[in-house]
Amino acid sequence: MNPEYDYLFKLLLIGDSGVGKSCLLLRFADDTYTESYISTIGVDFKIRTIELDGKTIKLQIWDTAGQERFRTITSSYYRGAHGIIVVYDVTDRESYANVKQWLQEIDRYASENVNKLLVGNKSDLTTKKVVDNTTAKEFADSLGIPFLETSAKNATNVEQAFMTMAAEIKKRMGPGAASGGERPNLKIDSTPVKPAGGGCC
């Protein structure tokens, strides 16, 4: 057992391009935000260690690094994930409609008992909102997964989203399943990607 942490959880952020996945990651891991974030900057993952119920949990949070623009993310990305956060943009109805497709990807590639969380991002853009909170909540409830609206821009519920996911995974794994000793093989893809403009509130 590594003395630095009790658990190591691999989390994934998936969803359509431009919904703010990278901004959520930067807000949670570094507490930073930028309007001019390049969607394909190629951040593979960030790490943040949290305390939960007296346990030290190391979260390894993976971003799609722009792959989602091609609608398919390689199956290896899902391998070994403990939790997957599906993100849509509350001002973009299509990104919400595509949540079902992302959930199908999870069913196809991720482990059967992986924890899921639905996140509606950009909640600060209240005047542009087109996806109703109640609609999304009912959909998430029907699937038995937690749901939160977040804003990476003003940090609303960002901490809560990742803490909720960590708590759900910890609950599923039980007290005897500390994964601190498991070392997932890290394969960092260094393929250069073409930057594309666009912010991600």
From Swiss-Prot:
The modification Cysteine methyl ester is found at C201. InterPro entries: P-loop_NTPase, Rab, Small_GTP-bd, Small_GTPase. The modification N-acetylmethionine is found at M1. It is found in: Cytoplasm; Membrane; Preautophagosomal structure membrane; Cytoplasm, Perinuclear region. A motif (Switch 1) lies at residues 30-45. GTP binds at residues 17-23, 33-36, 39-40, 66, 121-122, 124, 151-153. A lipid is attached at C200, C201 (S-geranylgeranyl cysteine). Transmembrane segments: none annotated. Prenylated; by GGTase II, only after interaction of the substrate with Rab escort protein 1 (REP1). Pfam families: Ras (PF00071). Its main location: cytoplasm. Keywords: Acetylation, Autophagy, Cytoplasm, GTP-binding, Hydrolase, Lipoprotein, Magnesium, Membrane, Metal-binding, Methylation, Nucleotide-binding, Phosphoprotein, Prenylation, Protein transport, Transport. Interacts with MICAL1 and MICAL2. Interacts (in GTP-bound form) with MICALCL, MICAL1 and MILCAL3. Interacts with GDI1; the interaction requires the GDP-bound state. Interacts with CHM/REP1; the interaction requires the GDP-bound form and is necessary for prenylation by GGTase II. Interacts with RabGAP TBC1D20. Interacts (in GDP-bound form) with lipid phosphatase MTMR6 (via GRAM domain); the interaction regulates MTMR6 recruitment to the endoplasmic reticulum-Golgi intermediate compartment. Interacts (in GDP-bound form) with lipid phosphatase MTMR7. Switch 1, switch 2 and the interswitch regions are characteristic of Rab GTPases and mediate the interactions with Rab downstream effectors. The switch regions undergo conformational changes upon nucleotide binding which drives interaction with specific sets of effector proteins, with most effectors only binding to GTP-bound Rab. Belongs to the small GTPase superfamily. Rab family. This is Ras-related protein Rab-1B. The lineage of its organism: Eukaryota, Metazoa, Chordata, Craniata, Vertebrata.
